[in-house]
Design a protein with these regions (language model features):
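Generic beta-sheet signal
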Residues: 1, 61-62, 86, 113, ...
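NAD(P)-binding Rossmann-fold cofactor-contacting core
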Residues: 1-15
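Short beta->alpha hinge that forms the Motif I/post-I loop of the SAM-binding pocket
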Residues: 3-4, 37-38, 62
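Short, well-ordered alpha-helix to beta-strand connector turns
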Residues: 17, 30, 56, 107-108, ...
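Short acidic-hydrophobic, aromatic-tinged amphipathic segments that line or gate anion-handling sites
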Residues: 18-23, 139-141
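Rossmann-like NAD(P)-binding element
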Residues: 23-53, 57-58
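Rossmann-like NAD(P)(H) cofactor-binding subdomain of soluble oxidoreductases
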Residues: 45-98
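Internal alpha-helical scaffold of NAD(P)-dependent oxidoreductase catalytic cores
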Residues: 104-186
């Protein structure tokens, strides 16, 4: 399933895939459902599929924030669903099926976050196996730890660039303008 007609056209042209026009139909018999869309669309997607999810399904995602998504999942009170958050640290600046390539996950980390009181260990291992077969190395973290660690790593390059620019502004240096112009891509 893909909302984008451009994405669907690309998939049909380049791969032998079955495409559903209805998201509820797409998940009906699935043992594993992966939400790979912008975080802002999660609630809408979950509301659309919640009555169609197979009992005991593994539900995961590929998003970069976990604590808020976990709240959405909890508030929807999904029954007989194994919610295990995933965050593959892979990809490029591009999105959609066109941005995929065979080695996308090879030797890349995938962080798994789960409430072990709500999900059986065999379900967690099954999802870890899924990511491993795609080439990923998996690491478990709590929802909170994930968000803390990733907020530091994703914001760190911006903080460094800001520090460089700030230092240049405070100096009387012949390269001051060049440092400011070329920091963080200009």
């Amino acid at each position: 399933y893909d909302k984008s007609s451009k994405g669907i056209d690309y998939l049909k042209k380049n791969f032998s895939v079955e495409i559903c026009s209805n998201i509820s139909d797409a998940v009906k018999e699935s043992d594993l459902v992966v939400i790979a869309s912008p975080l802002s669309s999660y609630k809408e997607i979950l509301l659309s599929i919640r009555t169609s999810l197979k009992e005991n399904v593994i539900l995961t995602d590929t998003g970069s924030a976990k604590k808020e998504v976990n709240k959405i999942i909890s508030n929807l009170n999904l029954k007989n669903v194994n919610w295990i958050a995933s965050h593959p640290i892979a990809g490029t600046e591009y999105s959609g099926p066109e941005a995929g390539f065979a080695s996308l996950f090879k030797n890349r980390w995938c962080i798994i976050s789960v409430d072990k009181k709500k999900v059986a260990e065999d379900k967690i291992k099954s999802l870890e196996n899924f990511w491993s077969k795609l080439g990923s190395k998996t690491k478990r973290m709590t929802f909170e730890d994930h968000d803390y660690v990733l907020s530091l790593t994703s914001h760190l390059p911006h903080a460094v660039a800001y520090s460089i620019v700030r230092s240049a502004i405070n100096k009387e240096d012949k390269f001051k303008d060049d440092v400011i112009q070329y920091s963080a891509g200009g």
